[in-house]
Swiss-Prot record:
Phylogenetic classification of the source organism: Bacteria, Bacillati, Actinomycetota, Actinomycetes, Kitasatosporales
Cofactor needs: Zn(2+)
Residues holding Zn(2+): 176, 355, 380, 384
Protein name in UniProt: Cysteine--tRNA ligase
Gene3D superfamilies from the UniProt entry: Cysteine-tRNA ligase, C-terminal anti-codon recognition domain, HUPs
Organism of origin: Streptomyces coelicolor (strain ATCC BAA-471 / A3(2) / M145)
Pfam families, alphabetized: CysS_C, DALR_2, tRNA-synt_1e
Keyword Metal-binding: yes
Main location: cytoplasm
Locus of motif 'KMSKS' region: 411-415
Start-end of each Sequence repeat: 36-49, 50-63, 64-77, 78-91, 92-105, 106-119
Catalytic reaction(s) noted: tRNA(Cys) + L-cysteine + ATP = L-cysteinyl-tRNA(Cys) + AMP + diphosphate
Protein backbone atom coordinates (compact mmCIF):
# COMPACT_ATOMS: atom_id res chain seq x y z
CA UNK A 1 0.00 0.00 0.00
CA UNK A 2 1.37 3.36 -0.94
CA UNK A 3 1.66 6.23 1.49
CA UNK A 4 -1.03 8.16 -0.33
CA UNK A 5 -3.49 5.25 -0.18
CA UNK A 6 -3.12 4.82 3.63
CA UNK A 7 -3.98 8.42 4.50
CA UNK A 8 -7.71 9.20 5.00
CA UNK A 9 -9.12 11.95 2.93
CA UNK A 10 -10.86 14.99 4.50
CA UNK A 11 -14.53 15.28 3.63
CA UNK A 12 -15.03 17.75 0.86
CA UNK A 13 -17.08 20.84 1.47
CA UNK A 14 -20.25 20.75 -0.59
CA UNK A 15 -19.97 22.80 -3.73
CA UNK A 16 -16.14 22.89 -3.86
CA UNK A 17 -13.38 20.82 -5.37
CA UNK A 18 -11.89 18.17 -3.09
CA UNK A 19 -8.52 18.81 -1.45
CA UNK A 20 -5.71 16.53 -2.47
CA UNK A 21 -4.83 13.75 -0.07
CA UNK A 22 -1.97 14.32 2.41
CA UNK A 23 1.28 13.30 0.70
CA UNK A 24 0.01 13.65 -2.86
CA UNK A 25 1.72 16.02 -5.21
CA UNK A 26 0.22 19.46 -4.99
CA UNK A 27 -0.84 21.20 -8.13
CA UNK A 28 0.67 24.47 -9.29
CA UNK A 29 -0.52 27.50 -7.18
CA UNK A 30 -1.44 30.61 -9.18
CA UNK A 31 0.56 33.71 -8.32
CA UNK A 32 -1.45 36.63 -6.90
CA UNK A 33 -1.65 39.74 -9.03
CA UNK A 34 -1.20 41.94 -5.88
CA UNK A 35 -0.14 41.60 -2.26
CA UNK A 36 -3.28 41.85 -0.06
CA UNK A 37 -3.16 43.70 3.26
CA UNK A 38 -3.75 41.90 6.53
CA UNK A 39 -7.34 43.10 6.55
CA UNK A 40 -7.84 41.81 3.03
CA UNK A 41 -6.53 38.43 4.05
CA UNK A 42 -9.15 38.22 6.79
CA UNK A 43 -11.92 39.07 4.42
CA UNK A 44 -10.65 36.83 1.60
CA UNK A 45 -10.44 33.29 2.98
CA UNK A 46 -9.46 30.37 0.82
CA UNK A 47 -12.40 28.96 -1.11
CA UNK A 48 -14.13 26.12 0.70
CA UNK A 49 -12.52 26.83 4.09
CA UNK A 50 -15.06 27.91 6.74
CA UNK A 51 -14.38 31.06 8.73
CA UNK A 52 -13.71 30.99 12.46
CA UNK A 53 -17.32 31.96 13.15
CA UNK A 54 -18.52 29.05 11.01
CA UNK A 55 -16.34 26.68 12.95
CA UNK A 56 -18.07 27.72 16.14
CA UNK A 57 -21.44 27.05 14.65
CA UNK A 58 -20.31 23.80 13.02
CA UNK A 59 -17.93 21.99 15.42
CA UNK A 60 -15.80 19.15 14.31
CA UNK A 61 -17.42 15.79 14.31
CA UNK A 62 -17.28 14.16 17.74
CA UNK A 63 -15.81 17.21 19.50
CA UNK A 64 -18.30 18.91 21.88
CA UNK A 65 -18.75 22.63 21.74
CA UNK A 66 -17.37 24.77 24.58
CA UNK A 67 -20.84 25.11 26.11
CA UNK A 68 -21.31 21.33 25.93
CA UNK A 69 -18.11 20.77 27.84
CA UNK A 70 -19.64 22.46 30.90
CA UNK A 71 -22.59 20.14 30.78
CA UNK A 72 -20.55 17.01 30.14
CA UNK A 73 -18.48 16.55 33.29
CA UNK A 74 -16.33 13.51 33.82
CA UNK A 75 -18.26 10.60 35.30
CA UNK A 76 -18.25 10.63 39.09
CA UNK A 77 -17.15 14.25 39.38
CA UNK A 78 -19.92 16.49 40.83
CA UNK A 79 -20.85 19.63 38.99
CA UNK A 80 -20.05 23.01 40.52
CA UNK A 81 -23.69 23.39 41.53
CA UNK A 82 -23.45 20.12 43.47
CA UNK A 83 -20.41 21.41 45.32
CA UNK A 84 -22.39 24.41 46.54
CA UNK A 85 -25.04 22.14 47.97
CA UNK A 86 -22.48 19.94 49.72
CA UNK A 87 -20.13 22.26 51.65
CA UNK A 88 -17.52 21.10 54.08
CA UNK A 89 -19.01 20.31 57.51
CA UNK A 90 -19.15 23.38 59.77
CA UNK A 91 -18.33 25.84 56.99
CA UNK A 92 -21.32 28.00 55.99
CA UNK A 93 -22.00 28.51 52.31
CA UNK A 94 -21.86 31.93 50.74
CA UNK A 95 -25.65 32.05 50.73
CA UNK A 96 -25.72 31.39 54.48
CA UNK A 97 -23.34 34.26 55.05
CA UNK A 98 -25.70 36.59 53.25
CA UNK A 99 -28.56 35.50 55.45
CA UNK A 100 -26.52 36.11 58.63
CA UNK A 101 -25.39 39.75 58.47
CA UNK A 102 -23.31 41.48 61.08
CA UNK A 103 -25.09 42.18 64.33
CA UNK A 104 -27.15 45.36 64.14
CA UNK A 105 -26.61 45.79 60.38
CA UNK A 106 -29.70 44.82 58.38
CA UNK A 107 -29.38 42.93 55.12
CA UNK A 108 -30.08 44.96 52.02
CA UNK A 109 -33.06 42.82 51.17
CA UNK A 110 -34.50 43.17 54.65
CA UNK A 111 -34.58 46.94 54.36
CA UNK A 112 -36.57 46.74 51.16
CA UNK A 113 -39.07 44.25 52.53
CA UNK A 114 -39.57 45.86 55.96
CA UNK A 115 -41.38 49.09 55.20
CA UNK A 116 -43.28 50.80 57.99
CA UNK A 117 -46.97 49.91 57.71
CA UNK A 118 -49.07 52.75 56.41
CA UNK A 119 -46.08 54.84 55.35
CA UNK A 120 -45.66 55.27 51.58
CA UNK A 121 -42.41 54.27 49.97
CA UNK A 122 -39.95 56.97 49.05
CA UNK A 123 -41.07 56.87 45.45
CA UNK A 124 -44.71 57.23 46.46
CA UNK A 125 -43.95 60.18 48.69
CA UNK A 126 -42.07 61.96 45.94
CA UNK A 127 -44.90 61.45 43.45
CA UNK A 128 -47.58 62.63 45.85
CA UNK A 129 -45.66 65.69 46.98
CA UNK A 130 -46.01 64.69 50.65
CA UNK A 131 -42.31 64.28 51.34
CA UNK A 132 -41.36 65.95 54.61
CA UNK A 133 -38.37 68.22 55.12
CA UNK A 134 -34.95 66.65 55.22
CA UNK A 135 -32.75 66.91 58.29
CA UNK A 136 -29.65 69.03 57.49
CA UNK A 137 -26.68 66.91 56.44
CA UNK A 138 -24.57 68.67 59.06
CA UNK A 139 -26.52 66.73 61.69
CA UNK A 140 -25.59 63.34 60.23
CA UNK A 141 -22.63 62.04 62.20
CA UNK A 142 -20.09 59.36 61.44
CA UNK A 143 -21.98 56.76 63.47
CA UNK A 144 -24.09 53.95 62.09
CA UNK A 145 -27.22 53.00 64.06
CA UNK A 146 -26.68 49.72 65.86
CA UNK A 147 -23.06 50.53 66.73
CA UNK A 148 -24.21 52.77 69.59
CA UNK A 149 -26.87 52.44 72.24
CA UNK A 150 -29.18 55.33 73.04
CA UNK A 151 -31.04 54.99 76.34
CA UNK A 152 -34.37 56.65 77.13
CA UNK A 153 -36.63 56.81 80.15
CA UNK A 154 -39.77 54.87 79.24
CA UNK A 155 -42.79 56.02 81.25
CA UNK A 156 -44.58 52.71 80.67
CA UNK A 157 -41.64 50.71 82.07
CA UNK A 158 -40.82 53.35 84.74
CA UNK A 159 -37.13 52.97 84.01
CA UNK A 160 -34.42 53.88 81.53
CA UNK A 161 -34.28 51.38 78.67
CA UNK A 162 -31.92 50.73 75.78
CA UNK A 163 -33.52 51.98 72.60
CA UNK A 164 -34.03 49.24 70.00
CA UNK A 165 -35.81 50.53 66.88
CA UNK A 166 -38.65 48.64 65.27
CA UNK A 167 -36.94 48.95 61.88
CA UNK A 168 -33.11 48.92 61.95
CA UNK A 169 -31.69 52.29 60.98
CA UNK A 170 -35.03 54.09 61.34
CA UNK A 171 -36.86 55.78 64.19
CA UNK A 172 -40.51 56.85 64.17
CA UNK A 173 -41.75 59.50 66.61
CA UNK A 174 -45.26 60.78 67.26
CA UNK A 175 -45.54 63.94 69.36
CA UNK A 176 -48.85 65.26 70.61
CA UNK A 177 -48.83 68.77 69.19
CA UNK A 178 -50.81 71.88 69.90
CA UNK A 179 -54.47 72.30 70.63
CA UNK A 180 -54.75 75.59 68.80
CA UNK A 181 -57.28 77.46 70.91
CA UNK A 182 -54.76 80.18 71.90
CA UNK A 183 -51.31 81.53 71.08
CA UNK A 184 -48.40 79.49 72.51
CA UNK A 185 -46.68 80.25 75.80
CA UNK A 186 -43.23 78.94 76.69
CA UNK A 187 -44.74 75.95 78.50
CA UNK A 188 -46.39 74.83 75.25
CA UNK A 189 -43.26 75.28 73.19
CA UNK A 190 -40.93 73.43 75.56
CA UNK A 191 -42.31 70.06 74.51
CA UNK A 192 -41.67 70.72 70.83
CA UNK A 193 -38.16 71.97 71.61
CA UNK A 194 -37.25 68.94 73.75
CA UNK A 195 -38.32 66.54 71.02
CA UNK A 196 -36.52 68.64 68.42
CA UNK A 197 -33.29 67.94 70.34
CA UNK A 198 -34.18 64.23 70.49
CA UNK A 199 -34.80 64.18 66.76
CA UNK A 200 -31.51 65.97 66.03
CA UNK A 201 -29.57 63.50 68.16
CA UNK A 202 -31.11 60.47 66.46
CA UNK A 203 -30.27 62.04 63.09
CA UNK A 204 -26.69 62.68 64.20
CA UNK A 205 -26.40 59.03 65.21
CA UNK A 206 -27.34 58.09 61.66
CA UNK A 207 -31.02 57.20 62.00
CA UNK A 208 -33.62 58.03 59.37
CA UNK A 209 -36.16 59.92 61.49
CA UNK A 210 -39.88 60.16 60.73
CA UNK A 211 -41.31 62.82 63.02
CA UNK A 212 -45.07 63.39 63.24
CA UNK A 213 -46.50 66.30 65.23
CA UNK A 214 -50.27 66.69 65.01
CA UNK A 215 -52.51 69.75 65.22
CA UNK A 216 -55.75 69.49 67.21
CA UNK A 217 -57.87 72.02 65.32
CA UNK A 218 -61.29 70.96 66.68
CA UNK A 219 -61.90 70.98 70.42
CA UNK A 220 -64.37 72.13 73.08
CA UNK A 221 -62.18 75.15 73.91
CA UNK A 222 -61.93 76.21 70.27
CA UNK A 223 -65.70 75.99 69.84
CA UNK A 224 -66.28 77.90 73.06
CA UNK A 225 -63.86 80.69 72.12
CA UNK A 226 -65.37 80.99 68.64
CA UNK A 227 -68.80 81.48 70.21
CA UNK A 228 -67.45 84.09 72.63
CA UNK A 229 -65.78 86.07 69.84
CA UNK A 230 -68.56 85.48 67.32
CA UNK A 231 -66.08 84.02 64.82
CA UNK A 232 -65.98 80.86 62.71
CA UNK A 233 -64.45 78.03 64.70
CA UNK A 234 -61.91 77.26 61.97
CA UNK A 235 -60.53 80.83 62.00
CA UNK A 236 -59.56 80.44 65.67
CA UNK A 237 -57.63 77.26 64.91
CA UNK A 238 -55.96 78.60 61.78
CA UNK A 239 -54.80 81.82 63.46
CA UNK A 240 -53.24 80.03 66.42
CA UNK A 241 -51.76 77.25 64.30
CA UNK A 242 -49.77 79.92 62.46
CA UNK A 243 -48.70 81.41 65.80
CA UNK A 244 -47.40 78.00 66.92
CA UNK A 245 -45.50 77.48 63.68
CA UNK A 246 -43.96 80.95 63.99
CA UNK A 247 -42.88 80.15 67.55
CA UNK A 248 -41.33 76.81 66.57
CA UNK A 249 -39.48 78.49 63.70
CA UNK A 250 -38.28 81.38 65.88
CA UNK A 251 -36.71 78.91 68.32
CA UNK A 252 -35.04 76.89 65.56
CA UNK A 253 -37.19 73.74 65.69
CA UNK A 254 -36.98 71.64 62.53
CA UNK A 255 -40.32 71.22 60.72
CA UNK A 256 -41.95 67.81 61.25
CA UNK A 257 -42.01 65.17 58.53
CA UNK A 258 -45.81 65.21 58.75
CA UNK A 259 -48.08 67.69 60.57
CA UNK A 260 -51.64 66.36 60.18
CA UNK A 261 -54.73 68.26 61.28
CA UNK A 262 -57.46 66.38 63.13
CA UNK A 263 -60.23 67.68 60.84
CA UNK A 264 -58.46 66.19 57.83
CA UNK A 265 -58.72 62.63 59.18
CA UNK A 266 -62.39 62.07 59.98
CA UNK A 267 -62.49 59.06 57.64
CA UNK A 268 -59.69 57.33 59.57
CA UNK A 269 -61.46 58.04 62.85
CA UNK A 270 -64.73 56.53 61.60
CA UNK A 271 -62.87 53.39 60.48
CA UNK A 272 -61.24 53.03 63.89
CA UNK A 273 -64.57 53.43 65.70
CA UNK A 274 -66.19 50.85 63.41
CA UNK A 275 -63.40 48.38 64.18
CA UNK A 276 -63.65 48.96 67.92
CA UNK A 277 -67.41 48.43 67.90
CA UNK A 278 -67.00 45.19 65.93
CA UNK A 279 -64.44 43.95 68.46
CA UNK A 280 -66.68 44.78 71.41
CA UNK A 281 -64.57 47.62 72.80
CA UNK A 282 -66.92 50.50 71.92
CA UNK A 283 -70.64 51.16 71.68
CA UNK A 284 -73.05 53.81 70.43
CA UNK A 285 -75.53 55.62 72.68
CA UNK A 286 -77.70 58.61 71.73
CA UNK A 287 -75.42 59.50 68.82
CA UNK A 288 -72.28 59.33 70.97
CA UNK A 289 -69.67 56.60 70.65
CA UNK A 290 -67.97 55.53 73.88
CA UNK A 291 -65.03 53.28 74.67
CA UNK A 292 -65.83 50.51 77.15
CA UNK A 293 -62.88 50.76 79.56
CA UNK A 294 -63.68 47.42 81.24
CA UNK A 295 -63.41 45.58 77.93
CA UNK A 296 -59.63 46.00 77.71
CA UNK A 297 -57.35 44.31 80.25
CA UNK A 298 -54.40 46.51 81.13
CA UNK A 299 -56.27 49.80 80.87
CA UNK A 300 -54.50 52.45 83.04
CA UNK A 301 -51.18 50.57 82.96
CA UNK A 302 -49.33 53.65 81.66
CA UNK A 303 -50.47 55.85 84.55
CA UNK A 304 -50.36 52.93 87.01
CA UNK A 305 -53.85 53.56 88.37
CA UNK A 306 -56.56 51.23 89.65
CA UNK A 307 -59.74 51.38 87.57
CA UNK A 308 -61.96 50.66 90.58
CA UNK A 309 -60.54 53.72 92.35
CA UNK A 310 -60.84 56.00 89.32
CA UNK A 311 -63.52 58.66 89.43
CA UNK A 312 -64.05 60.29 86.03
CA UNK A 313 -67.06 62.67 85.83
CA UNK A 314 -69.08 62.80 82.64
CA UNK A 315 -69.15 65.94 80.52
CA UNK A 316 -72.31 67.71 79.40
CA UNK A 317 -74.15 65.82 76.69
CA UNK A 318 -72.47 62.49 77.39
CA UNK A 319 -75.53 60.32 77.96
CA UNK A 320 -76.11 56.59 77.78
CA UNK A 321 -72.80 55.47 79.27
CA UNK A 322 -72.57 51.93 80.58
CA UNK A 323 -69.89 53.07 83.03
CA UNK A 324 -69.21 56.67 84.06
CA UNK A 325 -65.52 56.04 83.38
CA UNK A 326 -66.14 55.19 79.71
CA UNK A 327 -64.76 58.02 77.59
CA UNK A 328 -66.23 59.64 74.50
CA UNK A 329 -64.67 58.87 71.15
CA UNK A 330 -67.36 60.67 69.15
CA UNK A 331 -69.71 63.40 70.37
CA UNK A 332 -73.20 63.83 68.97
CA UNK A 333 -73.81 67.09 67.12
CA UNK A 334 -75.16 70.10 68.99
CA UNK A 335 -76.84 73.15 67.43
CA UNK A 336 -74.32 75.67 66.14
CA UNK A 337 -71.34 73.32 66.44
CA UNK A 338 -69.31 71.85 63.55
CA UNK A 339 -70.20 68.25 62.74
CA UNK A 340 -69.47 65.45 60.27
CA UNK A 341 -71.63 62.59 59.02
CA UNK A 342 -71.00 59.07 60.38
CA UNK A 343 -72.94 55.77 60.50
CA UNK A 344 -74.06 56.81 64.01
CA UNK A 345 -75.24 60.27 63.05
CA UNK A 346 -73.62 63.66 62.75
CA UNK A 347 -71.08 64.71 65.34
CA UNK A 348 -67.45 65.58 65.96
CA UNK A 349 -64.43 63.64 67.22
CA UNK A 350 -63.23 63.37 70.78
CA UNK A 351 -59.70 64.48 71.61
CA UNK A 352 -58.28 61.01 72.26
CA UNK A 353 -59.56 59.42 69.06
CA UNK A 354 -57.80 61.98 66.88
CA UNK A 355 -54.27 61.03 67.90
CA UNK A 356 -54.84 57.26 67.76
CA UNK A 357 -56.18 57.51 64.21
CA UNK A 358 -53.47 59.86 62.93
CA UNK A 359 -50.62 57.87 64.51
CA UNK A 360 -52.02 54.72 62.87
CA UNK A 361 -52.19 56.39 59.46
CA UNK A 362 -48.71 57.90 59.39
CA UNK A 363 -46.69 55.43 61.48
CA UNK A 364 -48.63 52.19 61.17
CA UNK A 365 -49.76 49.57 63.67
CA UNK A 366 -46.55 49.87 65.68
CA UNK A 367 -43.95 52.61 65.95
CA UNK A 368 -41.04 53.57 68.17
CA UNK A 369 -41.67 56.62 70.37
CA UNK A 370 -44.76 58.50 71.51
CA UNK A 371 -44.06 61.78 73.27
CA UNK A 372 -45.75 64.65 75.04
CA UNK A 373 -45.96 66.54 78.31
CA UNK A 374 -46.39 64.71 81.61
CA UNK A 375 -49.87 66.21 81.94
CA UNK A 376 -50.96 64.07 78.97
CA UNK A 377 -50.19 60.70 80.59
CA UNK A 378 -53.77 60.56 81.89
CA UNK A 379 -56.30 60.65 80.46
CA UNK A 380 -55.07 61.43 76.94
CA UNK A 381 -52.24 58.94 76.41
CA UNK A 382 -53.94 56.28 78.48
CA UNK A 383 -57.02 56.51 76.27
CA UNK A 384 -54.94 56.60 73.09
CA UNK A 385 -53.41 53.27 74.09
CA UNK A 386 -56.82 51.77 74.85
CA UNK A 387 -58.22 52.72 71.44
CA UNK A 388 -55.15 51.56 69.51
CA UNK A 389 -54.79 48.23 71.29
CA UNK A 390 -58.53 47.60 71.09
CA UNK A 391 -58.25 48.19 67.34
CA UNK A 392 -55.46 45.60 67.15
CA UNK A 393 -52.43 47.90 66.99
CA UNK A 394 -49.31 47.29 69.06
CA UNK A 395 -48.93 51.11 69.12
CA UNK A 396 -45.94 52.88 70.72
CA UNK A 397 -42.97 50.89 72.02
CA UNK A 398 -41.56 53.72 74.17
CA UNK A 399 -43.37 56.52 76.00
CA UNK A 400 -41.32 59.67 76.64
CA UNK A 401 -42.68 62.66 78.57
CA UNK A 402 -41.22 66.09 79.27
CA UNK A 403 -41.77 68.06 82.47
CA UNK A 404 -43.57 71.39 82.90
CA UNK A 405 -42.54 74.99 82.97
CA UNK A 406 -43.80 76.41 86.25
CA UNK A 407 -44.22 79.85 87.76
CA UNK A 408 -44.26 80.14 91.56
CA UNK A 409 -44.48 76.35 91.73
CA UNK A 410 -47.60 76.08 89.56
CA UNK A 411 -47.80 74.75 86.02
CA UNK A 412 -47.77 77.56 83.47
CA UNK A 413 -51.29 77.79 82.06
CA UNK A 414 -53.50 80.37 80.42
CA UNK A 415 -56.38 79.31 82.63
CA UNK A 416 -54.30 80.21 85.71
CA UNK A 417 -53.23 83.51 84.20
CA UNK A 418 -49.52 82.81 84.70
CA UNK A 419 -48.46 82.15 81.11
CA UNK A 420 -45.74 84.02 79.22
CA UNK A 421 -46.33 84.14 75.46
CA UNK A 422 -43.49 83.22 73.13
CA UNK A 423 -44.34 86.19 70.90
CA UNK A 424 -43.69 88.55 73.84
CA UNK A 425 -40.55 86.73 74.98
CA UNK A 426 -38.76 87.00 71.63
CA UNK A 427 -39.22 90.78 71.73
CA UNK A 428 -37.33 90.98 75.02
CA UNK A 429 -34.76 88.22 74.54
CA UNK A 430 -32.86 86.86 71.52
CA UNK A 431 -34.65 83.69 70.34
CA UNK A 432 -31.43 81.67 70.62
CA UNK A 433 -31.20 82.63 74.30
CA UNK A 434 -34.78 81.44 74.81
CA UNK A 435 -33.89 78.14 73.10
CA UNK A 436 -30.87 77.82 75.38
CA UNK A 437 -33.03 78.56 78.43
CA UNK A 438 -35.76 76.03 77.59
CA UNK A 439 -33.58 73.35 75.99
CA UNK A 440 -30.60 73.05 78.30
CA UNK A 441 -32.28 71.63 81.45
CA UNK A 442 -32.96 67.89 81.32
CA UNK A 443 -36.27 67.21 79.61
CA UNK A 444 -37.62 65.43 82.70
CA UNK A 445 -36.71 68.34 85.01
CA UNK A 446 -39.18 71.11 85.82
CA UNK A 447 -38.18 74.63 84.76
CA UNK A 448 -39.14 77.33 87.26
CA UNK A 449 -39.55 80.49 85.22
CA UNK A 450 -37.83 83.66 86.40
CA UNK A 451 -36.18 86.70 84.83
CA UNK A 452 -33.03 85.94 86.79
CA UNK A 453 -32.67 82.47 85.28
CA UNK A 454 -33.15 83.97 81.83
CA UNK A 455 -30.34 86.45 82.48
CA UNK A 456 -28.11 83.58 83.58
CA UNK A 457 -28.91 81.73 80.36
CA UNK A 458 -28.11 84.85 78.33
CA UNK A 459 -24.78 85.26 80.11
CA UNK A 460 -23.84 81.59 79.63
CA UNK A 461 -24.68 81.62 75.95
CA UNK A 462 -22.88 84.95 75.58
CA UNK A 463 -19.64 83.33 76.77
CA UNK A 464 -20.00 80.66 74.11
CA UNK A 465 -20.90 83.19 71.44
CA UNK A 466 -17.97 85.43 72.38
CA UNK A 467 -15.51 82.56 72.05
CA UNK A 468 -16.90 81.60 68.65
CA UNK A 469 -16.63 85.19 67.44
CA UNK A 470 -13.04 85.71 68.68
CA UNK A 471 -11.67 82.53 67.12
CA UNK A 472 -13.54 83.18 63.86
CA UNK A 473 -11.96 86.63 63.66
CA UNK A 474 -8.54 85.14 64.43
CA UNK A 475 -8.92 82.44 61.77
CA UNK A 476 -10.17 84.95 59.21
CA UNK A 477 -12.96 82.63 58.10
CA UNK A 478 -15.74 80.45 59.49
CA UNK A 479 -14.22 77.31 61.02
CA UNK A 480 -16.08 74.19 59.90
CA UNK A 481 -17.62 71.98 62.61
CA UNK A 482 -15.68 68.84 63.52
CA UNK A 483 -16.82 65.60 61.89
CA UNK A 484 -17.62 64.08 65.29
CA UNK A 485 -18.53 65.44 68.69
CA UNK A 486 -16.20 64.65 71.63
CA UNK A 487 -16.83 61.18 73.11
CA UNK A 488 -17.85 62.61 76.51
CA UNK A 489 -20.53 64.74 74.83
CA UNK A 490 -21.85 61.74 72.90
CA UNK A 491 -21.89 59.61 76.04
CA UNK A 492 -23.98 62.23 77.85
CA UNK A 493 -26.48 62.54 75.01
CA UNK A 494 -26.79 58.77 74.61
CA UNK A 495 -27.74 58.52 78.29
CA UNK A 496 -31.38 59.69 78.21
CA UNK A 497 -30.50 62.89 76.34
CA UNK A 498 -28.33 64.30 79.14
CA UNK A 499 -28.20 67.85 77.79
CA UNK A 500 -26.95 69.43 81.08
CA UNK A 501 -23.96 67.06 81.15
CA UNK A 502 -23.37 67.60 77.43
CA UNK A 503 -23.41 71.38 77.89
CA UNK A 504 -20.81 71.03 80.63
CA UNK A 505 -18.53 69.53 77.97
CA UNK A 506 -19.29 72.50 75.70
CA UNK A 507 -18.32 75.03 78.38
CA UNK A 508 -15.18 73.07 79.28
CA UNK A 509 -14.13 73.10 75.63
CA UNK A 510 -14.82 76.85 75.45
CA UNK A 511 -12.54 77.42 78.47
CA UNK A 512 -9.83 75.34 76.83
CA UNK A 513 -10.21 77.42 73.68
CA UNK A 514 -9.96 80.66 75.63
CA UNK A 515 -6.78 79.38 77.27
CA UNK A 516 -5.38 78.64 73.82
CA UNK A 517 -6.25 82.18 72.73
CA UNK A 518 -4.49 83.62 75.77
CA UNK A 519 -1.42 81.51 74.93
CA UNK A 520 -1.49 82.67 71.30
CA UNK A 521 -2.01 79.04 70.17
CA UNK A 522 -4.12 79.59 67.07
CA UNK A 523 -4.22 75.95 65.97
CA UNK A 524 -5.49 74.74 69.35
CA UNK A 525 -8.09 77.51 69.49
CA UNK A 526 -9.37 76.64 66.01
CA UNK A 527 -9.53 72.93 66.91
CA UNK A 528 -11.59 73.71 70.02
CA UNK A 529 -13.93 75.91 67.99
CA UNK A 530 -14.51 73.06 65.52
CA UNK A 531 -15.53 70.80 68.42
CA UNK A 532 -17.75 73.49 69.95
CA UNK A 533 -19.55 74.06 66.65
CA UNK A 534 -20.16 70.32 66.23
CA UNK A 535 -21.71 70.07 69.70
CA UNK A 536 -23.77 73.24 69.37
CA UNK A 537 -25.02 72.12 65.96
CA UNK A 538 -26.56 69.00 67.48
CA UNK A 539 -28.33 71.14 70.09
CA UNK A 540 -29.46 73.72 67.52
CA UNK A 541 -27.40 76.46 69.20
CA UNK A 542 -24.54 77.12 66.77
CA UNK A 543 -24.12 80.94 66.56
CA UNK A 544 -22.84 80.60 62.99
CA UNK A 545 -25.82 78.55 61.83
CA UNK A 546 -28.06 80.29 59.30
CA UNK A 547 -30.89 80.29 61.86
CA UNK A 548 -28.98 82.65 64.16
CA UNK A 549 -26.41 84.20 61.80
CA UNK A 550 -29.14 86.35 60.25
CA UNK A 551 -29.89 87.95 63.59
CA UNK A 552 -26.19 88.53 64.10
CA UNK A 553 -25.87 90.15 60.68
CA UNK A 554 -28.63 92.62 61.50
CA UNK A 555 -26.63 93.86 64.47
CA UNK A 556 -23.26 93.97 62.74
CA UNK A 557 -23.68 97.51 61.40
CA UNK A 558 -24.72 98.79 64.81
CA UNK A 559 -21.84 96.92 66.42
CA UNK A 560 -19.33 98.60 64.10
CA UNK A 561 -20.67 102.03 65.08
CA UNK A 562 -20.56 101.21 68.79
CA UNK A 563 -17.12 99.64 68.37
CA UNK A 564 -15.73 102.86 66.89
CA UNK A 565 -17.07 104.90 69.81
CA UNK A 566 -15.83 102.44 72.42
CA UNK A 567 -12.41 102.36 70.77
CA UNK A 568 -12.07 106.12 71.23
CA UNK A 569 -12.72 105.72 74.95
CA UNK A 570 -10.41 102.70 75.20
CA UNK A 571 -7.62 104.66 73.51
CA UNK A 572 -7.96 107.27 76.24
CA UNK A 573 -7.77 104.50 78.82
CA UNK A 574 -4.67 103.03 77.17
CA UNK A 575 -3.05 106.47 77.22
CA UNK A 576 -3.76 106.77 80.93
CA UNK A 577 -2.28 103.30 81.52
CA UNK A 578 0.82 104.27 79.54
CA UNK A 579 1.23 107.31 81.82
CA UNK A 580 0.61 105.02 84.79
CA UNK A 581 -2.44 107.08 85.65
CA UNK A 582 -4.22 104.07 87.10
CA UNK A 583 -7.00 106.10 88.70
CA UNK A 584 -8.11 107.53 85.36
CA UNK A 585 -7.83 104.14 83.64
CA UNK A 586 -9.96 102.47 86.31
CA UNK A 587 -12.52 105.28 86.21
CA UNK A 588 -12.96 104.85 82.44
CA UNK A 589 -13.37 101.10 82.87
CA UNK A 590 -15.98 101.58 85.59
CA UNK A 591 -17.93 104.10 83.50
CA UNK A 592 -18.03 101.65 80.59
CA UNK A 593 -19.17 98.93 82.98
CA UNK A 594 -22.05 101.08 84.17
CA UNK A 595 -23.07 101.40 80.50
CA UNK A 596 -23.33 97.61 80.23
CA UNK A 597 -19.91 97.00 78.65
CA UNK A 598 -17.35 94.52 79.98
CA UNK A 599 -13.68 95.33 79.30
CA UNK A 600 -11.21 92.46 79.06
CA UNK A 601 -7.46 93.12 78.84
CA UNK A 602 -5.64 90.59 76.63
CA UNK A 603 -2.17 90.29 75.03
CA UNK A 604 -3.75 91.50 71.78
CA UNK A 605 -5.17 94.58 73.50
CA UNK A 606 -8.41 95.43 75.29
CA UNK A 607 -11.65 93.78 74.16
CA UNK A 608 -15.19 94.75 74.97
CA UNK A 609 -18.43 92.82 75.11
CA UNK A 610 -21.96 93.35 76.34
CA UNK A 611 -22.52 92.35 79.94
CA UNK A 612 -25.57 90.55 81.29
CA UNK A 613 -28.75 92.48 81.84
Amino acid sequence: MSAGAGTPRRPAVRGSAPHPARGSAPGPRPMPTHHPTRGDKKRARRPGVPTRGDKKRAPRLGVPARGDKKRARRPGVPAREDKKRAPRPGVPTRGDKKRAPRLGVPARGDKKRARRPGVPTRGGVARSGNDGPRVPLALLGAYYPGHVTIRLYDTSARQIRDFAPLTPGCVSIYLCGATVQAAPHIGHIRSGLNFDIMRRWFAYRGYDVTFVRNVTDIDDKIIRKAAEQNRPWWSIGYENERAFNDAYAALGCLPPTYEPRATGHITEMVEMMRGLIERGHAYEADGNVYFDVRSLPGYLSLSNQDLDELRQPSEDGETGKRDLRDFAMWKAAKPGEPSWETPWGRGRPGWHLECSAMAHKYLGEEFDIHGGGIDLIFPHHENEIAQAKGFGDAFARYWVHNAWVTMSGEKMSKSLGNSVLVSEMVKKWPPVVLRYYLGTPHYRSTIEYSEESLREAESAYGRIEGFVQRVTELAGHAVEPAAEVPPAFAEAMDDDLGVPQALAIVHTTVRQGNSALAADDKDAAVARLAEVRAMLGVLGLDPLDAQWAGAQAQGEDLRHVVDSLVRLVLDQREGARARKDWATADAIRDQLGQSGLVIEDSPQGPRWSLGSR
